[in-house]
């Protein structure tokens, strides 16, 4: 069963100022909670383009959204293909785009997918089951230096070197094939005192592997840059992030487009080319309410940022 509790559901969609006949893009369909809430506000002239790289999510969403299928176009693709997706649908601009980043609960809860450090499964972690690169490939075949780099950069793991050394030693004996096998090796690389602090000891390495397998950060950066060009004037973009790397990236991109290019000195009137592309609706990210946290513990790290397109 594909059960998923959407985080900050109302806020994400309400900040889009939904027009009942508008065209919107859900870049991360997942359990379809946000999609359902949005579709309930669209009339029969409105349209939602629902993207997910996980075919299982799309198959499930068709059941969840069964009353609204005439208003939805499902696209099995990576959201970094936004421009091409709209081109294929003969759509030039849309009224709003939203992202709910991170792994959906079902992907974490289905052991076979290999995302969870609580269940034993093969080392997979692919959001798109048709792609070739898996966590098994990275753990067993990438160099010590490459492992250190991704654990540190994507997981902010301070014991990256020690963990990579333990992985190297184990895989010389035999391949590391399962999630719990990897968890035990990670624990060996972290001093006992540090293991007792900061949540599950494997959390940061598993996050790093997931980001590397799915190329998440560069895919998001590619996508958000395209989104800014694809939303109409006065349209909005909502982004929910779940870790500091994504949040920082989102904040930096929004800031860059809000600032606009450097204006040459002495101009009597500022040409439109030098005016900002967007404005941030919230300077500080919106965080989950107590109610959200009661429903879903994963909401604790969620942050929502919203921008409005100005030109």
Curated annotation (Swiss-Prot):
Q: What family, per the record? A: Belongs to the methyltransferase superfamily. RsmH family.
Q: Which reaction does it catalyse?
A: cytidine(1402) in 16S rRNA + S-adenosyl-L-methionine = N(4)-methylcytidine(1402) in 16S rRNA + S-adenosyl-L-homocysteine + H(+)
Q: Note the HAMAP family from the entry.
A: 16SrRNA_methyltr_H
The protein's matches in SUPFAM superfamilies, at most eight in alphabetical order, are given as:
Putative methyltransferase TM0872, insert domain, S-adenosyl-L-methionine-dependent methyltransferases
What is the source species? Staphylococcus aureus (strain bovine RF122 / ET3-1)
What is the designated name of this protein? Ribosomal RNA small subunit methyltransferase H
- Record has Transferase as a keyword: yes
Q: Which NCBIfam families match?
A: 16S rRNA (cytosine(1402)-N(4))-methyltransferase RsmH
GO CC terms: cytoplasm
General function of this protein: Specifically methylates the N4 position of cytidine in position 1402 (C1402) of 16S rRNA.
The chain's coiled-coil residues are none
- Keywords linked to the UniProt accession: Cytoplasm, Methyltransferase, rRNA processing, S-adenosyl-L-methionine, Transferase
Residue ranges annotated as transmembrane are: none
BP GO annotations: rRNA base methylation
Q: Where in the cell is it found?
A: Cytoplasm
GO: which molecular function terms? rRNA (cytosine-N4-)-methyltransferase activity
Which residues are noted in the entry as S-adenosyl-L-methionine-binding? Answer: 32-34, 52, 79, 100, 107
Gene name of the record: rsmH
Q: What is its EC number?
A: 2.1.1.199
Q: Which InterPro entries match?
A: RsmH (IPR002903), SAM-dep_MeTrfase_MraW_recog (IPR023397), SAM-dependent_MTases_sf (IPR029063)
